[in-house]
């Protein structure tokens, strides 16, 4: 009897274990499918945005053609013979077009009038490749003749060798040879065709160069910011090179990332870039940065390239590209009546930095003759000790004593982890939003791999509703309301505070972490995520 009972118990344990494993496997598969559907939905959303932008582009191009037609008609009006061979219907249409007094919208020819002197000034003089379109990520690599050493082949090998077969079908790498000497350009093309024959024939790699007529006269530029004549010429041409490359790349994919011809890439860089962009698909970002150096690793959404190129062309003679990019952000979101800190907070929502860096600069000799640049990205090999999220613009403050520059501001912006000396009862961390925010969820994670014990204990999460009168009418919130108007909605457990924010508390003016008891350890916050409601 005892043996029989043991057999039954064993069978029950086996069946229970089997059912549990089956349930867990089904749940895990369902979760993975849901995540895959979410990624596909975000990708579809981006493609629809691209399609809408291209429709507007076609409309703009049709208006440009119409303007050109008007100019031709105006020139022909002086000659009756020039119009005699048209039908009566066409002549009526010509008359209607001539009589319309439409305003003239500035375009690229306004800033670069020399382009009107030659047909094909905006068409590549050399174009090698299949012209692949419809990809997720377009990578642009400008290159020019270097007097000492070219790093182009090493750069391409680093990018291509770290792509999986599937990833090679979802991107295109454009090499822009910024030279008008066709003999030199063709030598570069021949060299790349020999080294990367498979990649070019498959459509992964393209090579283009601009016509000589694309460039204006660069010999009489005004010297500014203490730069020499040669440096002003170099940076001005560089701005024009970037614009040509971006205009060519815009229609090919969802995202465009700017690289250089003297870099190396990290393993899995492509999937990291794509997944990070998809995670932020609901955010109103303009630049994602995957390197802290210059223009390396700066990624844009295809529709935004129009604005960026237009802005650069307005001031291409005045300042370097990285300065102009910062000015675009300032114009979009900074209030002249607010201080620099407020401006930086606003810009941080448009310019989001990913760490650790995915690209490292390796070139010693600059494309500017005689310039040695020992530039390295210090974040390239750093382990990631914090997680990056886009949080609502807010003024952050704390009563805790910060350790070695690991400030709360940097953590909130996703630039670093927050590290502070031993908390005591009454200490707080406060996030005061620039404007009331509808918050869907919150997440605060303390400790990190190097200091796992530096966690928050006996700490609560509290929110301050913007509409206090409505909240006070609810009987179920009385016990959660504090004397200063905040409502306690959660607490840290095992170093983590995570949960939803009830809709009746929204919108929220501020969020606070309050320490209830003295702690025996220091504290690290390595992740802060205040997730806005998508409908906000």
From Swiss-Prot:
Required co-factor? a divalent metal cation
TM segment ranges: 7-27
As for PTM, the annotation reads: N-glycosylated.
Q: Which residues lie on this side of the membrane: Lumenal?
A: 28-536
Catalysed reactions, as listed in the record: N(4)-{beta-D-GlcNAc-(1->2)-alpha-D-Man-(1->3)-[beta-D-GlcNAc-(1->2)-alpha-D-Man-(1->6)]-beta-D-Man-(1->4)-beta-D-GlcNAc-(1->4)-beta-D-GlcNAc}-L-asparaginyl-[protein] + UDP-N-acetyl-alpha-D-glucosamine = N(4)-{beta-D-GlcNAc-(1->2)-[beta-D-GlcNAc-(1->4)]-alpha-D-Man-(1->3)-[beta-D-GlcNAc-(1->2)-alpha-D-Man-(1->6)]-beta-D-Man-(1->4)-beta-D-GlcNAc-(1->4)-beta-D-GlcNAc}-L-asparaginyl-[protein] + UDP + H(+); an N(4)-{beta-D-GlcNAc-(1->2)-alpha-D-Man-(1->3)-[alpha-D-Man-(1->6)]-beta-D-Man-(1->4)-beta-D-GlcNAc-(1->4)-beta-D-GlcNAc}-L-asparaginyl-[protein] + UDP-N-acetyl-alpha-D-glucosamine = an N(4)-{beta-D-GlcNAc-(1->2)-[beta-D-GlcNAc-(1->4)]-alpha-D-Man-(1->3)-[alpha-D-Man-(1->6)]-beta-D-Man-(1->4)-beta-D-GlcNAc-(1->4)-beta-D-GlcNAc}-L-asparaginyl-[protein] + UDP + H(+); an N(4)-{beta-D-GlcNAc-(1->2)-alpha-D-Man-(1->3)-[beta-D-GlcNAc-(1->2)-[beta-D-GlcNAc-(1->6)]-alpha-D-Man-(1->6)]-beta-D-Man-(1->4)-beta-D-GlcNAc-(1->4)-beta-D-GlcNAc}-L-asparaginyl-[protein] + UDP-N-acetyl-alpha-D-glucosamine = an N(4)-{beta-D-GlcNAc-(1->2)-[beta-D-GlcNAc-(1->4)]-alpha-D-Man-(1->3)-[beta-D-GlcNAc-(1->2)-[beta-D-GlcNAc-(1->6)]-alpha-D-Man-(1->6)]-beta-D-Man-(1->4)-beta-D-GlcNAc-(1->4)-beta-D-GlcNAc}-L-asparaginyl-[protein] + UDP + H(+); an N(4)-{beta-D-GlcNAc-(1->2)-alpha-D-Man-(1->3)-[beta-D-GlcNAc-(1->2)-alpha-D-Man-(1->6)]-beta-D-Man-(1->4)-beta-D-GlcNAc-(1->4)-[alpha-L-Fuc-(1->6)]-beta-D-GlcNAc}-L-asparaginyl-[protein] + UDP-N-acetyl-alpha-D-glucosamine = N(4)-{beta-D-GlcNAc-(1->2)-[beta-D-GlcNAc-(1->4)]-alpha-D-Man-(1->3)-[beta-D-GlcNAc-(1->2)-alpha-D-Man-(1->6)]-beta-D-Man-(1->4)-beta-D-GlcNAc-(1->4)-[alpha-L-Fuc-(1->6)]-beta-D-GlcNAc}-asparaginyl-[protein] + UDP + H(+)
Q: What class of enzyme is it?
A: transferase
Q: What is its EC number?
A: 2.4.1.145
Name this protein carries in UniProt: Alpha-1,3-mannosyl-glycoprotein 4-beta-N-acetylglucosaminyltransferase A
């Amino acid at each position: 009897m005892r043996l029989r009972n043991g057999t039954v118990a064993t069978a029950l344990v086996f069946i229970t274990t089997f059912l549990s494993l089956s349930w867990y496997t089904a749940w895990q598969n369902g979760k993975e499918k849901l995540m895959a559907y979410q990624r596909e939905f975000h990708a579809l959303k981006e493609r629809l945005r691209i399609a809408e932008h291209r429709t507007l582009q076609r409309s703009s191009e049709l208006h440009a053609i119409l303007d050109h037609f008007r100019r031709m008609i105006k020139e022909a009006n002086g000659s009756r013979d020039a119009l005699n061979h048209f039908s009566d219907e066409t002549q009526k249409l010509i008359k209607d077009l001539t009589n319309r007094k439409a305003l003239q919208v500035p375009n690229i020819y306004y800033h670069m009038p020399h382009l009107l002197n030659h047909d094909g000034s905006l068409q590549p003089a050399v174009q090698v490749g299949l012209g692949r379109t419809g990809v997720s990520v377009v990578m642009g690599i400008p290159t020019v003749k270097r007097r000492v050493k070219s790093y182009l082949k090493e750069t391409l090998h680093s990018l291509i060798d770290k792509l999986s077969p599937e990833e090679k079908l979802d991107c295109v790498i454009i090499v822009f040879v910024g030279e008008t000497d066709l003999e030199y350009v063709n030598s570069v093309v021949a060299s790349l065709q020999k080294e990367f024959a498979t990649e070019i024939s498959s459509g992964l790699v393209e090579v283009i160069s601009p016509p000589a007529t694309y460039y204006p006269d660069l010999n009489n530029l005004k010297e500014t910011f203490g730069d020499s004549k040669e440096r002003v010429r170099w940076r001005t041409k560089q701005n024009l090179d970037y614009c040509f490359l971006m205009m060519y790349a815009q229609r090919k994919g969802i995202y465009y990332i700017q690289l250089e011809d003297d870099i190396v890439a990290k393993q899995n860089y492509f999937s990291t870039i794509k997944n990070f962009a998809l995670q932020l698909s609901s955010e109103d970002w303009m630049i994602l940065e995957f390197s802290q150096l210059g223009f390396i690793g700066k990624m844009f959404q295809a529709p935004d390239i129009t604005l960026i190129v237009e802005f650069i062309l307005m001031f291409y003679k005045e300042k370097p590209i990285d300065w102009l990019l910062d000015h675009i952000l300032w114009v979009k979101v900074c209030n002249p009546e607010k201080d620099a800190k407020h401006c930086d907070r606003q810009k941080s929502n448009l310019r989001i930095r990913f760490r650790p860096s995915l690209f490292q600069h390796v070139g010693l000799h600059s494309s500017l003759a005689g310039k040695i640049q020992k530039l390295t990205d210090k974040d390239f090999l750093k382990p990631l000790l914090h997680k990056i999220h886009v949080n609502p613009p807010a003024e952050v403050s704390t009563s805790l004593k910060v350790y070695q520059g690991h400030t709360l501001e940097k953590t909130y912006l996703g630039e670093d982890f927050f590290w502070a000396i031993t908390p005591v009862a009454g200490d707080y961390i406060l996030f005061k939003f620039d404007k009331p925010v509808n918050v869907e969820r919150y997440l605060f994670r303390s400790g990190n791999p190097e200091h796992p014990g530096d966690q928050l204990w006996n700490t609560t999460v509290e929110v301050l509703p913007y509409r206090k009168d409505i909240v006070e009418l609810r009987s179920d919130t009385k016990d959660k309301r504090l004397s200063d108007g905040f409502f306690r909605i959660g607490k840290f457990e095992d170093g983590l505070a995570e949960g939803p924010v009830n809709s009746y508390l929204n919108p929220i003016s501020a969020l606070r972490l309050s320490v209830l008891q003295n702690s025996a350890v220091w504290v690290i916050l390595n992740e802060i995520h205040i997730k806005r409601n998508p409908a906000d």
